[in-house]
Amino acid sequence: MSAFTPASEVLLRHSDDFEQSRILFAGDLQDDLPARFECAASRAHTQQFHHWQVLSRQMGDNVRFSLVAQACDIADCDTLIYYWPKNKPEAQFQLMNILSLMPSGADIFVVGENRSGVRSAEQMLADYAPLNKVDSARRCGLYHGRLEKQPLFSLEPYWDEYSIDGLIIKTLPGVFSRDGLDVGSQLLLSTLTPHTKGKVLDVGCGAGVLSAALASHSPKVRLTLCDVSAPAVEASRATLAVNGLDGDVFASNVFSEVKGRFDMIISNPPFHDGMQTSLDAAQTLIRSAVRHLNSGGELRIVANAFLPYPKILDETFGFHDVIAQTGRFKVYRTVMTRQAKK
């Protein structure tokens, strides 16, 4: 992260106002402004592992990655700067959590792109920190209020679930396809045959639906699941547990924390990071899969048909097959052979 996002550029227009502030940055932290902002003290909390990776290099222990913020994350902060995400339930979850810990009278700033729905912050916080719009630029809004009443926060009400083929899928705000199985994952699931064996890695596991479905008809598989999202990691753990399935689940920026090689890697890779379109994760997934597949191991991914993954697959593995498709999605399969670029 080097270039600032439009939301951060709006904040920088008011940088003089924060020189004496002790700030907690939270929400959709798409750049390293929390590490570079001139203020009395700066801390950050994020649910995104890749954001933590970047910020921790500069902020050390003053940034923390976890599902929920705790009192230690607030420390003696008197100001919250919250970057609004594109997902309103995610914002509700994060803000209620953080505001339950902030001191009464704390300055609350909410900033975000208009297209993300940042305007709804006013209604969401009306009972706790009534907001006023203090700036509008770069197609973003900046809102300010003071914390008048701390909300009560409990994680339990934010859990949700849905069923698919006899499996219970546990979800949380911010998890991909929180309200039900998405069409792409459904297509990928249709290609997974029963009695699969060996070590399987599910990258970008979301709520764990792919792994749970695979394990339900292939009990001999050994599952490893990873995601950048703390809610996804916790949801996947809960999905496996409630269905009596075993697997190793942890946070990882694609392969950053993955050790060893696998017989199959499956993924429905994201092509957005917050509001921004980004193919970085998918490109890293494909190009680096060769370092995590056994000889003869298989990479199987689903993607929107318009995305340029066939070219990357061919450049990396030498070939690819389309094993299922609809008008919108394709499932790509390739195999680790000697011609793959290691």
From Swiss-Prot:
Coiled-coil residue windows: none
Superkingdom: Bacteria
Cell compartment(s), UniProt: Cytoplasm
Claim: Methyltransferase is one of the keywords in the record: yes
GO terms, molecular function: 16S rRNA (guanine(1207)-N(2))-methyltransferase activity; nucleic acid binding
EC number annotated for this UniProt entry: 2.1.1.172
Keywords, ordered alphabetically: Cytoplasm, Methyltransferase, rRNA processing, S-adenosyl-L-methionine, Transferase
UniProt cross-references to InterPro entries, sorted A to Z: DNA_methylase_N6_adenine_CS (IPR002052), Mtase_sm_N (IPR013675), rRNA_ssu_MeTfrase_C (IPR023543), RsmC/RlmG (IPR046977), SAM-dependent_MTases_sf (IPR029063), Small_mtfrase_dom (IPR007848)
Recorded catalytic activity of this chain's protein: guanosine(1207) in 16S rRNA + S-adenosyl-L-methionine = N(2)-methylguanosine(1207) in 16S rRNA + S-adenosyl-L-homocysteine + H(+)
Pfam families given in the database record: MTS, MTS_N
A Gene Ontology term for the protein's cellular component: cytoplasm
NCBIfam families: PRK09489.1
Family per similarity comment: Belongs to the methyltransferase superfamily. RsmC family.
Function statement: Specifically methylates the guanine in position 1207 of 16S rRNA in the 30S particle.
Subunit structure: Monomer.
PANTHER family per UniProt: RIBOSOMAL RNA SMALL SUBUNIT METHYLTRANSFERASE C (PTHR47816:SF4)
Protein name: Ribosomal RNA small subunit methyltransferase C
Source organism per UniProt: Salmonella arizonae (strain ATCC BAA-731 / CDC346-86 / RSK2980)
